[in-house]
């Protein structure tokens, strides 16, 4: 069931066309700003971009003009021509383009290729379409800042993004998807629904969980804890900092230092914010002598870690600098490994299904170039993961070289509303850290026996999982996860007492409910509850008091009058079963 990712596959017609669209856009921008300095302009998954150093800041109002000029170039049916020349000739050609000159200096060959169309030429390996008229369906989307070569110490360029497809129908479909994705963007919904906030005064990538988001997170964490206790895990807690020497022993200081924060001096010793929880769990395991009969031992923690990310890649909750992992580490004998990984995959699938995720892909990531340990152990660990995937009948792709430095891993990646993949559950087999920390148990023969270790998360980080969950449901969480599950709306002041009585009964069942007794009209109250994506609105008036019923209106617009007792039973059943249906 494994498919190898083929990085050597030929360039598709679509990718070629998108690359050509980037060149056409560059020519259009140069016609508006002849003094522009050009960065790079590749094809990307859904289109293209090009980076420019311009005399003024672009605004969204500039995009239609650039697009108009692009369309004129397309209609001109200009040929794309490839030329080869020496690097010295190319330096003369790009004498006024400093970024191109820098790229030229990095090329080791003495001969380089350029592409021309119309009055434009670019340093480029190609290939391109034959004529500009082949670029038929494109749309400029946005402008963003991008540091030259991704280096925050280099100039900030202006990046123009565009979408491009082989036909207009495919482009229209993609633009419709973008429109829907914009509605579901967790950054937008996070603000509207008051789930979380980010503040530059605190720092980039550091999240405040607001009350509505905090209750959703709490519910996820409580469910996570109960499920882990049921499955034989022990809950633990660990500190947020540790001495640098600990990370030197683990190998993180050598292999992972660029993702760690700078050390802080405490009483003459160097400490650092933890990027991982694993080393703490290892020391807990070593807290006393253990027998092989105790294995497997499973330690689980909702542990907050800190990893450096460049400011340019921070993205709402999806890419942050401080986050809480649903982390666990399993210590077991070698012959217990496969069974334990099978169990972890079963738990991960159970979690994914419970939260209603349907779009995700599974990757088996193998040995990277920089690694520790013996090859035979790497092969054994990789084989264990593959067998566990096949035992669970989970289709997967092999992702060569994407394992961590101490072992191979299974990655389950959630797909967001834009089709982008975000890291979710991960399972890693590790023989190296137990060796580095001399982890062993007393075997049946009374001698020390080596221990294997499984690193795993079944949600990923709470922050990233919340971003995926928010976009999955467009902020309209299932009833069991909704910050407010019901809103009781009295039609007039005389109905407020009855509304409060119903709310009190629901609160006794731990339902999150409020009464909207404000002076606004009933329609305004219903509208505001719908905007807050509250699953159920219970309208009560004279009839409802007389019959002990409620007029139930769901956030999707369906309406039904039913006895209050019946509604309460229905809601409690949906909460208990964690139904994704309203």
Curated annotation (Swiss-Prot):
Membrane-spanning segments: none
Sorted alphabetically, the Gene Ontology cellular component annotations on this record are: cytoplasm
Q: Where is the signal peptide?
A: none
Per the record, what are the reactions this protein catalyses?
A: tRNA(Thr) + L-threonine + ATP = L-threonyl-tRNA(Thr) + AMP + diphosphate + H(+)
Example GO biological process: threonyl-tRNA aminoacylation
What's noted on cofactor binding? Answer: Binds 1 zinc ion per subunit.
Q: What EC number(s) does its UniProt record assign?
A: 6.1.1.3
> Mind telling me which PROSITE patterns this protein's record contains?
AA_TRNA_LIGASE_II
State its cofactor.
Zn(2+)
What are the start and end residues of every segment in region (Catalytic)?
Answer: 185-478
Q: Name one GO molecular function term.
A: metal ion binding
Q: Which residues bind Zn(2+)?
A: 278, 329, 455
Q: Which Pfam families match?
A: HGTP_anticodon (PF03129), tRNA-synt_2b (PF00587), tRNA_SAD (PF07973)
Name the keywords, alphabetized: Aminoacyl-tRNA synthetase, ATP-binding, Cytoplasm, Ligase, Metal-binding, Nucleotide-binding, Protein biosynthesis, RNA-binding, tRNA-binding, Zinc
Q: Which family does it belong to?
A: Belongs to the class-II aminoacyl-tRNA synthetase family.
**HAMAP family, per the entry:** Thr_tRNA_synth
Q: How does it assemble?
A: Homodimer.
What is the name listed in the Swiss-Prot or TrEMBL entry for this protein? Threonine--tRNA ligase
């Amino acid at each position: 069931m494994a498919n190898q990712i083929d990085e050597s596959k030929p360039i598709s017609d679509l990718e070629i066309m998108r690359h050509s669209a980037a060149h056409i856009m560059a020519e259009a921008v140069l016609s508006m700003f002849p003094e522009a300095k050009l960065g790079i302009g590749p094809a990307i998954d859904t289109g293209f971009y090009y980076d420019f150093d311009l005399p003024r800041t672009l605004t969204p109002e500039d995009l239609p003009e650039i697009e108009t000029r692009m369309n004129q170039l397309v209609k001109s049916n200009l040929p794309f021509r490839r030329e080869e020349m020496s690097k010295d000739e190319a330096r003369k050609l790009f004498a006024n383009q400093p970024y191109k000159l820098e790229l030229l200096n990095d090329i080791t060959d003495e001969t380089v290729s350029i592409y021309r169309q119309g009055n434009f030429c670019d340093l480029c390996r190609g290939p391109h379409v034959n004529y500009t008229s082949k670029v038929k369906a494109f749309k400029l989307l946005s402008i963003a800042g991008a540091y030259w070569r991704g280096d925050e110490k280099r100039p900030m360029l202006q990046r123009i993004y565009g979408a491009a497809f082989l036909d207009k129908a495919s482009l229209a479909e993609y633009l419709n998807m973008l429109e829907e994705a914009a509605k579901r963007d967790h950054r937008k919904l996070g603000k509207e629904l008051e789930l979380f906030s980010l503040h530059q005064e605190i720092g980039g990538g550091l999240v405040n969980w607001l009350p509505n988001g905090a209750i959703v997170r709490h519910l996820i964490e409580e469910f996570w804890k109960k499920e882990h206790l049921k499955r034989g895990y022990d809950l633990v807690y660990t500190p947020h900092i540790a001495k640098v020497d600990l990370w030197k022993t683990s190998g993180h200081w050598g292999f992972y230092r660029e993702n760690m924060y700078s050390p802080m001096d405490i009483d003459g010793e160097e400490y650092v914010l933890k990027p991982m929880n694993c080393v703490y769990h290892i020391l807990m395991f070593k807290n006393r002598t253990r027998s092989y009969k105790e294995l497997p031992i499973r330690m689980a923690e909702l542990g907050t870690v800190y990893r450096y990310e460049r400011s340019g890649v921070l993205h709402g909750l999806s890419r942050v600098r401080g986050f809480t992992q649903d982390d666990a580490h399993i210590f077991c004998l070698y012959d217990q490994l496969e069974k334990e990984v099978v169990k972890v995959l079963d738990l991960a699938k159970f979690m994914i299904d419970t939260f209603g995720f349907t779009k995700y892909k599974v990757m088996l990531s193998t040995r990277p170039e920089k690694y520790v340990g013996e090859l035979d152990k790497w092969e054994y660990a990789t084989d264990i993961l593959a067998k566990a995937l096949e035992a669970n009948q989970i289709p997967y792709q092999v992702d060569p070289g994407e394992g961590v430095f101490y072992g191979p891993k299974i990655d389950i990646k959630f797909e967001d509303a834009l089709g982008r993949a975000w890291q979710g559950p991960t399972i890693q087999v590790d023989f190296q850290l137990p060796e580095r920390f001399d982890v062993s148990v007393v075997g049946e023969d009374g001698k020390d026996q080596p221990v294997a270790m499984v690193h795993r998360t079944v949600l990923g980080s709470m922050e990233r999982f919340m971003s995926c969950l928010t976009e999955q449901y467009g902020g309209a969480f299932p009833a069991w996860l909704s910050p407010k599950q019901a809103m009781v709306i009295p039609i007039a002041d005389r109905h407020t007492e009855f509304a409060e009585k119903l709310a009190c009964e629901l609160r006794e069942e731990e339902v999150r409910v409020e009464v909207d007794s404000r002076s606004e009209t009933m329609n305004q109250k219903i509208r505001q509850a719908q905007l807050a994506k509250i699953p159920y609105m219970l309208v009560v008036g004279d009839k409802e008091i007389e019959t002990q019923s409620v007029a139930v209106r769901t956030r999707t617009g369906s309406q039904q009058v039913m006895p209050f007792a019946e509604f309460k039973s229905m809601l409690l059943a949906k909460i208990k079963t964690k139904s994704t249906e309203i």
